[in-house]
Structure formats: structure tokens, C-alpha cells
Amino acid sequence: GDVLIDLVDIGAGTRGLDYIQCIPGGVPGEKHAPNLFTHVDRFLFVNLDGKRFIKEDARRDVLRDAMLDQPKAIAWTIVDADGFEQLKNSKGPENEVALKTGTLYYADSIEDLAKKIGVPANNLKEAVDTYNKGC
């Protein structure tokens, strides 16, 4: 931010600064953020109600707006065990740290995961079932 302002002050041009692009993953106050959204065909987003609210392959600006519209602007990224395994080569270290620090959760069932992340199990199950039918 500060360097950009200094560059503009000395004449640097800018473009596209009237919007932001964002993707999920950051946990406020945490140094190690889990990364589960590399492979769009392996994850889904749910809100604090456990409901899927967007197609995960949407453009970043559409994702941003949809996430910011959710309760408390929070969304969970849900990935199955196979998807998590696929990420080990590229994102394994970050995800392992996130598991240890409690910013990433592992569960043996949808009901267990719902309990860990504090969402209604029936909504999460419906979101996962609907997602799986579309794959």
C-alpha cells in the first residue's frame, strides 16, 4: 500500500484499483492460512448456516461479493479426503500447520465436521449432497 502511494506520487500509472479481488483462506490474526481452494473441482463453499451460496468456479469478483454478503462475511471451504490428498504436494505444509493451529479441521463424517465448524449438520449434508450430484 505505502509503496504504491509513493509510486503514484512520482507519476506511476494505475489501473483497476477501484475494486479488489479476493479468494478465501485468510484467518484474522493467524500466520498460517489453510489453502483448500486450488482445485475448483475438489471443494465447495458454505456459509455459517452450512449452506452453499455460490458456484465455486465463479469469477473472483463474483466470489468476493458473494462472500462479503454472507453472515459476518465468513465462509468455510469444504474438501473431501481425496481433495486434501491432492493438495499435499503443493499446499501440504501450510495445511499441516493449519491443522495443528486449529484453523483447519479434519472430520470423519459430515456430522462431525458440522459440529467442529459450528454449522447445522442437516444444512451441511444437503450442501455436500447437492454439490456431489453436480460433479
Description of each model-found segment:
Residues 1:
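Gly/Ser/Thr-rich active-site loops/lids in small-molecule metabolic enzymes
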Residues 4-119:
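An anion/pyrophosphate-binding glycine-rich loop and adjacent beta-alpha core
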Residues 115, 119-135:
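C-terminal catalytic domains of large/alpha subunits in multi-subunit enzymes
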